[in-house]
Swiss-Prot record:
It comes from the Eukaryota. Plasma. This is Antithrombin-III. The modification Phosphothreonine is found at residue 64. GO terms for biological process: blood coagulation; regulation of blood coagulation. Phosphorylated by FAM20C in the extracellular medium. The gene is Serpinc1.
């Protein structure tokens, strides 16, 4: 949340608050009404003038960039868009590890690192000095070679187009952004324009000062609508008050149909073995067929299940029973994950996977501070002069919230159930490899061409919901 700095003057002065709310659902590319940019997806850099108050250029090439600089850029992909996708993946694994360290090993985790990056990229539009530098470093935007902080927004627009504007509509991947600002404030015109053109985030005025509770209800209703009712009351009572000036909301909703569905007739209750040694019954789905698979270091199994259309997949990472999932989480890096994915090959498998749903919500503040995003949350140090007109420098982020939802079931393609994998009854074929997710595992949902991690999480206890 954005708030005025301590040196801003009188007690009770207005504060500017940012809430970053992240969900799973259906998404569309930024559509800008009443803007000279007719189609952001075919626009050139000169068509989208991004003129923030401050610009940051990385002092030198990062070692992490050098590590992957020789990798082949996907076909018909701008190199900088590809590097942005890689930067988002670096942030994803780094943030996930910080979050996992703060959680109990028996807790489920689910988040959209892409949604978090998007929300803070919009915040970066108004940042200066060390606040801008820390945003560039923590979110790994500084690993994009030879480009400045203002150009990141153009690449985000192109990345969003690649992710959300698909010819294949068999899977719903939808993102929505909105700025809710207090009607008594005048917001920087450039900040509003770029937020709308690049991120599709229109500014909606609300009366936080006189009607904070009604404003909270309005925002929660907007979030519920954009997530098909999956996320409700995301902003708790009291989070918005008469001092609030701005609430930034980002939502992502995903619903995918399996390319090869699990037959409900093959689902049966089986035990799931939790970290604490206890077990609980879960509906365990089952199918046999060819999937991309690999047994990697120390017996960890990696399985990729495609959604219809093949452009988005779910990746499951299952340690062997003798190795804890926490150990795999600690060792995971973007480079190691990419190595595992590159090694996947078509394998005849017997797949056992629990049917489950999970919802996770938490504050982002503590983890981001631990990662080095210090000034943004400090009333004394934050520099966000590019958000409110007049360049006022008394704004800071008091908190940011994330919420995500995932449901996995047997559903496959609605009209094309006859896919390349034939579903059979349960068997004991000794010649087929078994992938049985009856113990804690990692789950990722990614876009294949750019290897963009859209969602990431841990299923440690599928019995809770």
């Amino acid at each position: 949340m954005y708030s005025p700095g301590a040196g801003s003057g009188a007690a009770g002065e207005r504060k500017l608050c940012l809430l970053s709310l992240l969900l799973i659902g259906a998404l569309g590319c930024a559509i800008c009404h009443g803007n000279p940019v007719d189609d952001i997806c075919i626009a050139k850099p000169r068509d989208i003038p991004v003129n923030p108050l401050c610009i940051y250029r990385s002092p030198g090439k990062k070692a992490t960039e050098e590590d992957g600089s020789e990798q082949k850029v996907p076909e018909a992909t701008n190199r900088r868009v590809w590097e942005l996708s890689k930067a988002n993946s670096r942030f994803a694994t780094n943030f996930y590890q910080h979050l996992a360290d703060s959680k109990n090993d028996n807790d489920n985790i689910f988040l959209s690192p892409l949604s978090i990056s998007t929300a803070f990229a919009m915040t970066k539009l108004g940042a200066c000095n060390d606040t801008l530098k820390q945003l560039m470093e923590v979110f790994k935007f500084d690993t994009i070679s030879e480009k400045t902080s203002d150009q990141i927004h153009f690449f985000f627009a192109k990345l969003n187009c690649r992710l959300y504007r698909k010819a294949n509509k068999s899977s719903d991947l939808v993102s929505a952004n909105r700025l809710f600002g207090d009607k008594s404030l005048t917001f920087n015109e450039s900040y509003q324009d770029v937020s709308e053109v690049v991120y599709g985030a229109k500014l909606q005025p609300l009366d936080f000062k006189e009607n904070p509770e009604q404003s909270r209800v309005t925002i929660n209703n907007w979030v519920a609508n954009k997530t098909e009712g999956r996320i409700k009351d995301v902003i708790p009572q009291g989070a918005i008050n008469e001092l609030t000036a701005l609430v930034l909301v980002n939502t992502i909703y995903f619903k995918g149909l399996w390319k090869s569905k699990f037959s409900p007739e093959n689902t049966r209750k089986e035990p799931f073995y939790k970290v604490d040694g206890q077990s609980c019954p879960v509906p365990m789905m089952y199918q046999e067929g060819k999937f991309k698979y690999r047994r990697v270091a120390e017996g960890t199994q990696v399985l990729e299940l495609p959604f219809k259309g093949d452009d988005i997949t779910m990746v499951l990472i299952l340690p062997k029973p003798e190795k804890s999932l926490a150990k795999v989480e600690q060792e995971l890096t973007p480079e190691l994950l990419q190595e595992w994915l590159d090694e996947l090959s078509e394998t005849m498998l017997v797949v056992h996977m629990p049917r489950f749903r999970t919802e996770d919500g938490f504050s982002l503040k503590e983890q981001l501070q631990d990662m080095g995003l210090i000034d943004l949350f400090s009333p004394e140090k934050s520099q966000l002069p590019g958000i409110v007109a007049g360049g006022r420098d008394d704004l800071y982020v008091s908190d940011a919230f994330h919420k995500a939802f995932l449901e996995v079931n047997e559903e496959g393609s609605e009209a094309a159930a006859s896919t390349s994998v034939v579903i059979t009854g349960r068997s004991l074929n000794p010649n087929r490899v078994t992938f049985k997710a009856n113990r804690p595992f990692l789950v990722l949902i990614r876009e294949v061409a750019l290897n963009t991690i859209i969602f990431m999480g841990r299923v440690a206890n599928p019995c809770v919901n």
